[in-house]
Amino acid sequence: MKTLLKKQAILDIIMTPEDDDWFRLVSYRYDENNRCDVFKITGDDGDHLYVLFSEDGTLIKGCDHESCFSPYLLDEGTEDADAQSQSERLAFIDSMYHGIPKSLLALLTEDMEREAVTFCMWQNADETIWHRSQVPQPDTCLQQDSNVLDDGGEKRLMAYIFPSADQWYEWAAIYYELREEGWDAAARIYDSEELTRTMVEDLNPDRDYDSIIDECEVSGLL
């Protein structure tokens, strides 16, 4: 998964200049303090997904603002967010992180919107299975169609991690209005080929190759 996300982050850098990085789907940085790789996926609706990799394992935290699991919906229906409603919201947030090993939970720093969470999953380094938060559905879920399963946005947000170049291209053709010439270049990046000027030109002729290489090297993507 980490390799896939790095490839997507490189493709987003190619498609969008650094000044407009807010438009990118996947952003990446390395947290020196916690020694972990930090990826953030930002949907066009403002929902987000953090994927954190460390030597202790992987932590994924997502937020779908329309989900009935959104902590902020607990305040709806009240004239103001009184002390009781705030206490209930904080308790609900804590329950989302219940069971996560301390070494993984410590990776979630202040700037990662800790209170904005509708699902959480993690995997210890010595395991192959994923653990998920076991949170009872709040009363806000009762207002939804009983035939619709609310997973906190997990399926929708995790779908932004594209396993193949074909799937990335299908998304990028709409989001970035990517030309057909870009498909082969995207496939070569997915195949871990060295990034060339021709590949950049095929994907986005408006971007400067050297500035892309510089940003990728500084961030640790190359």
Give a label for each model feature.
Residues 58-59:
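Primarily extracytoplasmic ectodomains and periplasmic/lumenal surface modules that are beta-strand-rich
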Residues 63-71:
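Short, solvent-exposed aromatic-acidic interface loops
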Residues 1-46, 55, 71-222:
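N-terminal domain-onset segments
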